Amino acid sequence: QPTVSIGLSKLREHFNDPLFVRIGNNMQPTDLSNNIYNDVHDILIRLQSINDFNLAFDPKTSNHQFNISMTDISHLVLLPKLINYLREHSPHIRLNIVPIDTHTQASMASGDIDLAIGFLPQLEAGFYQQTLFQQHYVVVANANHPRLSQKSLTHEQYASELHIDILATGGHYVVEHELQKLGVKRNILVRLPSYLGVGLVVQETDAIATIPNYLSKVLLSRGDLKILDLPYAFPEYGVKQHWHSRVHQNPSNQWLRRLCFELFSNL
C-alpha cells in the first residue's frame, strides 16, 4: 500500500492531475485517467510479456542456440561431454563454438558470446567467473620412446629431449614463464598453433610435449602414448567459465552455467 501511494503521488505530480477523485464512497478516475488508460494498459501487458519471456526458458523444449567461446583444449576435453548431455536431455538446443581471440571480450560485452570456457587470464578482470576445476602440467611421449622408460623425467632428460611447443593462448605462457624462472631452455623441434595436432605428432616422433593433465588423458585414450611427470613443480591453474554482467540474470545463461559446473567440476 505505501508503495502504491508513493507511485500515485509521483504520477499526480507529473501529470498535474489527481487521476482519481472520491465520489460518494468510491474512487473514480478523472478524464485524464480515462484518456491514458488504454496506453498504460498496453504498456503493462508488454512489460508482463517481457517478464514472462525472461522466465520461460525450458531446456527440455527450447531450441535456443548458445554461442560459447572455448580454448582448443576445451574442445577436446569438455565439449564432447556437453554435447552428449544435450543430445539426451535437451535435444533441441544447439551450440555454436567460436575460438578465443582478441575479439572475445568485446563479443561477450555485446552479447554475441554467451560464455567463455578455459584458462583465460585476459578475462580475469571485468567479467563474472567460476572455477570449474584445477589443472596441472605433465609430459606426453611416444609409448615406445627409445630413451624414456621411467614414469618421470629427470632435469637432464627434459633439457636434452626434443620438444613440441604449443603456442595456444593462456597455457603456453604458463609453461614459458615457469621454465624461464627456472632457467630451463627447451630444444624446440616444432611449434604448433594449437593443441589439436599434438597427440599425432608425439605418437609419430620421439619429441615430447608439456601439456595439461586432462588433455593428456584424452590423448592417451586415443593414441599410443604415455604420460610422464615433470621434473619441476609447476603451479596449478584454474579452468573457469566466464560471462558478462549483461547475461548474469538471464535464465538460459544461468542454466548453461549450472550445467557446465555440474558436468565439469568433478572431472
Task: Give each language-model segment a name.
Residues L78, K226-L267:
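A late-sequence structural motif
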Residues H14-F15, I36-D58:
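Alpha-helical linker/hinge and terminal dimerization helices associated
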